[in-house]
Swiss-Prot record:
Annotated Gly residues bias: 869-897
Name of the protein: Transcription elongation factor SPT5
GO BP: any one term: positive regulation of autophagy
Biased composition (Polar residues): 79-89
Phylogenetic lineage: Eukaryota, Fungi, Dikarya, Ascomycota, Saccharomycotina
Species this protein is from: Debaryomyces hansenii (strain ATCC 36239 / CBS 767 / BCRC 21394 / JCM 1990 / NBRC 0083 / IGC 2968) (Yeast)
Region (Disordered): 1-191, 839-897, 914-967
SUPFAM superfamilies on file: Translation proteins SH3-like domain (SSF50104)
Compositionally biased residues, Basic and acidic residues: 64-78, 169-191
This protein's encoding gene: SPT5
Length: 967
């Protein structure tokens, strides 16, 4: 027993002795009396109180010594202190000896209860000694159990702490020798403080501890990213790979096995994750790079180990991908593959069911097999053929797709039919049939997931029972197919149109606003109008279409071009990020659509495609036997038709009987003046108060559907009777095309191809060109000798549709000959521009009658062998030896021997000096030009006589008489 414990025990005994002085005897021993249990309990309580008060007294002294030690003062016990300790120890020993003597003397007198109390005190004293002896080796400041904490109050805790500190200091002083120093005690105290703080940290609440660590180890600096932090985006340059990143290797493999190898490497890494993990980080492949897979690893040896035992791959043929090519290689591209999930439509690529539509029912665990639902093709053995060996010959014709029939299978091929799991499940020839459909497993490579495009008749085969419950909504599918076709065609290319206001959604240029300039398949060129960086304003940027979003304002009138609300129009009432809420014009309800599915609509019915484009605006349709009309407005599920009676009717597409397609020849009428009117002619109402005018759109019997640019209602279309209008201009009239200045004549560089020939053209005031729908022959140019039909014509040119080539050409009218009853008549002659018989000169100014004058003078070059109506040896137009209109021999114009216009041998131009020389001379003998000798006598082209000089030859030339007024 230590001296400290002896001190406490002795003092406690002394207190007990003094409290019971009356019980002492002369021999110095206590007088023990018989007491009941209550007295014994009271004495024990008093003992405990005395012990507690003694401990408090000593705790005060130990507290003072502890404060001195914490201030760094190391006190060594003095001689007086040591003597005090020794004396207290001796006193304790003496007291113990006295107690033992008293106990021996009074053993017989003490009852069993007192012995038990003493035993309990000794046991508790031993326990206390053992617990205090370990104070130097355990953390005396550790917290006790929760039960003890509940029992102890704050005062008891402080008292216990001070007592234990006092005991520890006392023990330290007791065990101290000369070698101990103040530094060692200070170091021991610091260790205990560190352990105490660590224990407190471990006992803290998890949330408090996490907040403490966050505040302790948080970053004290941030990386500057400019304005991108405020906008919520990160610059792509900060995400660029570097040489510190793991390397990527391109491994060559068998083409077509890329995805299979990636899947196998993934399974291998997952299998060896615990026993012998692979050190590869990533495995991927790109559809655009056939025959390669890519593995990311820190060491090449890890790739060799991962590829050990793999087939269809060439492990030695690997390439290190440069770091600068990482972004292009790792760029996220939308895969063209369709994710295979139950319920999607696919097509089979091999076997009896090649190109048949199927529905995915389930997938295998390895992902390589697909269980599909098909409409079976069975003939139940009715068309089976067998060879000599009894083997079945496969039929070359495929049976039509029909649902499985149990009756036919039992009737024709019952030996191969077995019952399956379920009331309508069967196994026929090793294949499973349920509810009439075939359920069969196919390899993944035998499944086509792209460009499936199911047809309505194929989908109808999968429809069973109630369409609302088990079947398919064919109407919805048809609408989706229509929308799909529209989006794949014009829809995709027209999602963004030049002039649209757009905003960049993501990337480095996010929040940039611009205007679309041009579009391509996947890229849009915009002109920046608003940007956070002023240097980009008014600059052109090329942005992927997926990164753009259309911008609209509240109040814009828009039209939906894609989705289930396609072709609906409405008014924008709210913009919510990428979505727009609009009020539909048709249903008067709010509709939410994606902003890129909208375009601005100028008219509610413009460009509306109803019933797949069967009808369009301004079409002439027939509603019933007696009612026809023109479509003036088209909505999603109805049309507005202006009838021939002038009534506006709203009809469904099913209410339209047919579309009237009348030829131009059938659409002809006469106006109130009796003039012919046709489609395209401009007419004006002469009866009524409105006096409307416009171009004829359709003609049906006596009703004219006219389109006016001055009327806004019904797309500018109105209807009237043909007898109420008069023709202003016709479609092919020159007047209608020459109301403005003729720019061709104002330009000196543009001249008519043949001014002389066109001088005889007469300006038409009304009616169509005579060449329209005539068969013509091309006389000159690259198409010389080809025939065709004139489809259009103006004052100079004609457009011809060739017979031999399905081609239209444009040629001048003067180079054409009109075919009339097999005879080719030149154009100028066809239009009646010639001045008289035998004269093809269109103007009628040179030769013959000039300016409506009588033909008294021979032609300009007549006489001799001249062709322009001259006589000579060859009579012209029935003439004899004389020239045009000359006398003598056989006259050509006037015939016989009778001279023309009383002229005998004299001149035809009023003269009487026949036989004289021409050109006013009288001494010209016989000239060759028109002489009596055959072919000019002895002179040609004047012989010895030249143009008025008569030396030799016959008579004068130029009409056998005096010409131009000579005698």
């Amino acid at each position: 027993m230590s001296e400290e414990e002896n001190r406490i025990t002795t003092s406690s005994d002394d207190v007990i002795k003094h409290e019971h002085p009356d019980n002492s005897t002369a021999g110095g021993a206590y007088e023990v009396q018989d007491r009941d249990q209550n007295d014994i309990d009271e004495e024990e309580e008093e003992k405990e109180e005395n012990k507690r008060s003694a401990e408090e007294e000593y705790s005060i002294g130990s507290k003072r010594s502890l404060e001195d030690s914490e201030e760094g003062e190391s006190k060594v016990p003095t001689e007086n202190d040591q003597a005090l300790i020794n004396n207290s120890g001796e006193g304790a020993e003496q007291q113990d000896n006295g107690d033992e003597a008293n106990d021996d003397e009074n053993d017989d007198e003490n009852d069993e209860d007192e012995d038990e109390d003493e035993d309990e005190e000794e046991v508790s004293s031993n326990k206390r000694k053992r617990r205090r002896g370990a104070n130097q080796f355990i953390d005396i400041e550790a917290e006790v159990d929760d039960e003890e904490e509940d029992e102890m109050d704050e005062d008891d805790e402080e008292a216990e702490l001070l007592r234990e500190q006092f005991i520890a200091d006392d023990s330290r002083v007791e065990t101290m020798d000369g070698k101990d120093s103040a530094g060692e005690h200070q170091d021991d105290r610091l260790h205990r403080q560190f352990d105490r703080r660590r224990q407190e940290a471990e006992d803290q609440d998890a949330e408090v501890l996490a907040e403490t660590l966050k505040q302790r180890y948080r970053k004290t600096h941030t990386v500057y990213r400019g304005d991108t932090t405020a906008s919520g985006t990160v610059s792509q340059k900060l995400l660029m790979p570097s040489i510190n990143d793991p390397a990527i290797y391109a491994i060559r493999c068998t083409p077509g096995r890329e995805k299979d190898l990636v899947r196998k490497l993934y399974e291998k890494k997952r299998t060896l994750a615990r026993s012998n993990p692979l050190e590869i980080l990533t495995v991927f492949q790109r559809d655009s790079f056939k025959g390669y897979i890519y593995i990311e690893a820190k060491k090449p040896e890890a790739i060799e180990r991962a590829l050990t035992g793999m087939v269809n791959i060439y492990a030695k043929q690997r390439l290190l991908v440069p770091v600068r090519e990482y972004p292009d290689l790792l760029k996220q591209v939308k895969s063209s593959d369709v994710e295979i999930v139950p319920g999607i439509y696919v097509r089979i690529t091999r076997g009896k069911y090649k190109n048949d539509l199927a529905i995915v029912d389930n997938l295998s665990e390895n992902g390589l097999d697909v269980r599909c639902k098909l409409v079976p093709r069975l003939d139940y053995g009715k068309n089976d053929d067998f060879d000599k060996d009894g083997k079945r010959i496969r039929s070359k014709t495929k049976p039509i797709p029909r649902l499985f029939s149990e009756q036919e299978a039992r009737m024709y091929d019952g030996e191969y039919l077995q019952s399956g799991r379920g009331p309508r499940a069967f196994i026929y020839r090793g294949e499973e049939y349920n509810e009439g459909f075939l359920f069969k497993d196919f390899k993944l490579q035998f499944i086509q997931t792209k460009d499936v495009h199911p047809k309505l008749e194929e989908l109808d085969r999968f429809q069973t029972g109630d369409p609302e419950e088990d079947g398919l909504d064919l109407a919805a599918i048809a609408a989706s197919l229509k929308n799909k076709n529209n989006s794949e065609g014009a829809g995709r290319s027209s999602a963004f149109q030049p002039g649209d206001k757009v905003e960049i959604r993501r990337g480095e240029q996010a929040k940039t606003i611009g205007k679309v300039l041009s579009t391509s398949l996947n890229e849009i060129t915009i002109l920046v109008t608003d940007s956070g960086d002023p240097k980009f304003v008014n600059q052109r940027l090329t942005v992927p279409a997926n990164d753009l979003r259309k911008l609209f304002s509240a109040g814009d009138h828009v039209r939906v071009i894609e989705g289930k609300h396609s072709d609906e129009t409405g008014l924008v009432i709210k913009i919510d990020n990428d979505s727009v809420i609009l009020l539909s014009d048709q249903t008067k309800q709010d509709v939410r659509v994606f902003a890129n599915y909208l375009i601005k609509a100028t008219d509610a019915s413009s460009n509306t495609d109803v019933t797949g484009g069967k009808y369009d605006l301004n079409d002439l349709v027939q509603l019933n036997v007696s009612t026809v009309g023109v479509i003036v407005k088209a909505e999603k599920s109805s049309f507005e038709v202006l009838t021939s009676e002038g009534r506006l009717m709203s009809v469904n597409p099913a209410g339209i009987a047919s579309k009237l397609e009348l030829s131009r020849r059938e659409q002809i009428a006469t106006d109130r003046n009796g003039s012919t009117v046709k489609i395209g002619d401009t007419v004006k109402e002469v009866l009524g108060d409105k006096k409307r005018e416009g171009a004829i759109l359709h003609i049906y019997k006596n009703s004219l559907f006219i389109k006016s640019n001055e009327i806004l209602e019904n797309l500018g279309v109105f209807v009237t009777n043909c007898m109420n209008v008069s023709t202003i201009t016709t479609k092919d009239s020159i007047v209608s095309k020459s109301l403005g200045p003729d720019l061709n004549r104002m330009n000196p560089n543009l001249k008519l191809p043949n001014p002389i020939a066109n001088a005889g053209l007469k300006t038409r005031v009304g009616g169509r060109d005579k060449l329209i729908y005539k068969d013509v022959l091309v006389n000159s140019g690259n198409y010389k000798g080809l025939m065709g039909k004139v489809t259009e014509a103006d004052e100079v040119y004609a457009r011809i549709e060739l017979h031999t080539k399905s081609k239209k050409i444009k040629v001048t009218k003067n180079s054409l000959s009109v075919l009339v009853r097999g005879e080719a008549i030149p154009y100028l002659r066809f239009i009646g521009a010639s001045s008289g018989p035998g004269n093809s000169n269109p103007s009628g100014n040179f030769g013959g009658a000039s300016f409506n004058q009588p033909a008294k003078t021979p032609a300009f070059s007549s006489g001799g062998k001249s062709s322009w109506g001259s006589g000579g040896a060859t009579p012209s137009v029935g003439g004899g030896a004389t020239a045009w209109g000359s006398g003598g021999a056989q006259s050509s114009w006037g015939g016989g021997k009778t001279p023309a216009y009383n002229s005998g041998n004299a001149s035809t131009w009023g003269g009487n000096a026949g036989g004289a020389s021409a050109w006013g001379n009288n001494n010209g003998n016989a000239s060759t030009w028109g002489s009596n000798s055959k072919n000019g006598g002895s002179s040609t082209w004047g012989g010895n006589s030249t143009w008025g000089n008569s030396n030799k030859g016959g008579k004068s030339s130029w009409g056998n008489g005096s010409a131009w007024g000579g005698k």
